[in-house]
Amino acid sequence: KSGMEKTVQELVKELRKMSSVVQTDKDLANVACVSAGGNTDIGSLISDAMAKVGRTGVVTMEEGKTAEDQLVFVEGMQFERGYTSPYFVTDPERMICEYENCKILLVDKKISTARDIITILESAIRGNYPLLIMAEEVEQEALATLVVNKLRGTLKVVAIKAPGFGERRSSYLEDIAILTGGTVVGDEMGVSLEQATDAVLGTAAKITITKERTTVVGDGSTAADVAARVKQIRNLQMQTDQDYEREKLQERIARLSGGVAIIQVGAQTETELKEKKLRVEDALNATRAAVEEGVVPGGGCTLLRLSEKVDVIKRRMTDPEQQMGADIIKRALCYPIKLIAQNAGVNGSVVMNEVMKNLDRPHYGYNAATDSFENLMETGIIDPSKVVRCSMENAVSVAKTFLLADVVVTELKEIEAGAKPNPVAPGAAGFGGGL
């Protein structure tokens, strides 16, 4: 067990030396294309999305409303919260609420009645400016008052729920306050709702609200504050160890920085749409991984090259059991390229031997799509280093679990009469069974 762990730790260091930084948009497109099963359209779409929002920007995916794939770029800050009542819409044809030069009230608590915000509402009526109210919740009594005044034409107003929950909601509200130059009203902030005046209001150049989402475009007057906030969030991102938390912090940075790219996946049928969404999701994850840790030429060829480093690592081990663990890793690293070759209908051992004879050519490898040996970096057959690293680390983690388990229950597959065994399966002739 410890032999496998030590071997993989050393191989990860070797992998980092073999990795190349993603330098061009074409490299990103190639990574996405390979991960999407060779779909060049998906690769180009993801490459274009990253070109618009930057390498560290946020690219999301959603179901499109047409049969064609589309790339939509949203300026400003967008989040998944829509208007609380359809009576707030200003454009009945498109069912959206849209205001320019809008004031924003940010409340980190529930608004129970209109009396809670009477001072703010009176200021909006006197100033004749549109008002967006963003709160944890606007309860029925307060909502009814706002709707009646909107329908009468007394107030240009719209209310939405604040994005997020708990601490994350408070952070989002702070982000919006910094973008718009406002102040968050709440007990924890030291500003009570009853005493709040128009001094706490933020300003947006434009707001667009649909049934499902809200977009706020700042007026640019708070650029310095936004830059400082982004720097602060980046520091938090560097300190956290959780991938989910890091991803959410990255989303906040992208929203504050002024843009999110949305890939709208289109298809003719529901079945095609599900399959296509999985391909796009895989391609997006692979592209992010490539930006994070670089790329290597062909994952199978890279693993085979790493297998040649194992003997050096093994010689530094004194424990025979650890050396056995290193041997297991070496044999395992040879399997992927054989399986790739077999799936392409060629002899895996022949392909492996050809690559092994050219270890001095770091980018040389087998392209299963064209059944040829070539420079994989030049032809775009590249894989994210992070994917290769995680595959090794996760494989060892699973193997450790099996070694420590008393018993493993699995389904016994019946081999049909006359069926040929998998030539790269553990226990096949020439591959030292027992792995």
From Swiss-Prot:
Pfam families: Cpn60_TCP1 (PF00118). The keyword Phosphoprotein does not apply. Keywords: ATP-binding, Chaperone, Chloroplast, Nucleotide-binding, Plastid, Stress response. GO terms for molecular function: ATP binding; ATP-dependent protein folding chaperone. One of its GO terms (cellular component) is chloroplast. It comes from the Eukaryota. GO terms for biological process: protein refolding. It is found in: Plastid, Chloroplast. Induction: By heat shock. InterPro entries: Chaperonin_Cpn60_CS, Cpn60/GroEL, Cpn60/GroEL/TCP-1, GroEL-like_apical_dom_sf, GROEL-like_equatorial_sf, TCP-1-like_intermed_sf. Its main location: plastid. Belongs to the chaperonin (HSP60) family. This protein binds RuBisCO small and large subunits and is implicated in the assembly of the enzyme oligomer. Oligomer of probably six alpha and six beta subunits. This protein shows ATPase activity. This is RuBisCO large subunit-binding protein subunit beta-1. It comes from Chlamydomonas reinhardtii.
